[in-house]
Amino acid sequence: MNLKQILVLFLFSSVFISCEKKSEEVKPNVNYIYEATYLDTFKMGNSDLVLKVQQMHESIIKKDYESAGSYLADNVEFRLEDGSTIEGKDNCMKFMVEAYSAVEIEDYNVAVNLAVTGDNGDEWVLLWDNGSVVTEDGTSSSFNWMESFQFENGKIIMMNQFSKPRN
């Protein structure tokens, strides 16, 4: 074999080996200390749902509550940072209008947003965001929020929210 043939054989072998189907990753069996009461196995989910959550937030900031409400299912439930729960789209819409009409949200940022799907098929968007809430008298308070949005048939059926003041 001459050098040219060896080089062609080497290149062909490299391409063939790199195109070979990789075996599936074997996930280790983990013995958790605490057993999850809901789910403990997720995979990355539908990123279109992240966009829906972002569009809903954009609508709230722009005070376009009708658009914000278009992302909510009729049976939506809001679990708020103060521990209260609001049930039903009409009640959640009323809450959004009352809570956000009297304030401005400034310097809004998203730190983390990702879609996950549980091994039971439940679809979620997890969002870590922050911003400043400015009241009518000009008082500004900054917050970090952590929210989870559960989706069913492309609509939000549950939102769970936590917040803390940002330094």
Question: Where on the chain are the PLM-derived regions?
Answer:
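A mature extracytoplasmic/lumenal domain signature
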Residues: 72, 82, 129-131, 147, ...
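A short hydrophobic beta-strand element
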Residues: 121-131
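Acidic pyrophosphate-coordinating catalytic loop
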Residues: 115-120
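Short, cysteine-centered beta-strand-loop-beta hairpins and adjacent loop/turn segments enriched
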Residues: 132-142
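Sec-dependent bacterial lipoprotein signal peptides
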Residues: 1-17
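Short, low-complexity N-terminal intrinsically disordered segments enriched in polar/charged residues
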Residues: 19-62, 66, 70
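A solvent-exposed, acidic/Ser-Thr-rich amphipathic alpha-helical stretch
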Residues: 34, 65-114
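Short beta-strand edge/turn micro-motifs at domain boundaries
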Residues: 23-27, 142-167
